Design a protein with these regions (language model features):
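Short metal-coordination and nucleic-acid-contact micro-motifs, chiefly zinc-binding Cys/His arrays
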Residues: 1-7, 31-34
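Cys/His/Pro-rich metal-binding microdomains
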Residues: 7-12, 36-40
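Short recognition patches in nucleic-acid-associated and regulatory proteins
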Residues: 13-29
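Short Cys/His-rich "knuckle" micro-motifs
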Residues: 17-22, 48-55
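Cysteine-rich micro-motifs
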Residues: 27-51
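Extended interfacial segments that mediate partner engagement and assembly in macromolecular machines
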Residues: 54-89
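Short, Lys/Arg-enriched alpha-helical microdomains
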Residues: 109-123
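Long C-terminal interaction/binding lobes of large macromolecular proteins
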Residues: 121, 125-134
Length: 134
């Protein structure tokens, strides 16, 4: 595995690949998972999950506030396909096209808080339109 350098966007420190226990302690939802954690942790609370196969980061490091915003954006977008409004693939394609993003950048784990707000608003509009059409 090639070593990669990841810098924390909040404090500028280097991030390191660590086991899930560093982030979650004994309560890790997936003890085998890996995370990129800011080298200033716990003073700086930024981290992001790593892809299981490649060990590349799934997105950008995020603090607690941004992680919550990303979670909320996922819940909003996922509601479109979980409620049968469209398929999962269609929901993510909608996200990509509506935001003018290339496929490789259409991942909520890469989004800022403002982009997450766009996802939430977009999802609301589509849920409302589907309800009116029903």
């Amino acid at each position: 595995m090639k070593r990669i350098n990841i810098t924390c966007p909040a404090c500028g420190s280097r991030a390191y690949l660590r086991p899930a226990s560093v982030v979650y302690g004994d309560k890790a939802p997936d003890p085998d998972a890996k995370y990129y954690v800011c080298g200033r942790s716990p003073a700086c609370d930024c981290y992001v999950a790593a892809h299981r196969k490649t060990m590349l980061p799934m997105g950008t490091l995020a603090d607690k506030t941004l992680r919550k915003k990303r979670h909320d954006a996922h819940v909003a977008l996922d509601s479109l396909w979980k409620n049968g409004i469209m398929s999962r693939k269609e929901a993510y394609r909608l996200l990509q096209l509506s935001m003018g993003l290339p496929a490789e950048d259409a991942h909520i784990a890469k989004f800022s808080a403002a982009r997450c707000d766009e996802v939430i608003a977009l999802s609301r509009r589509f849920r409302a339109a589907a309800a009116r059409a029903a």
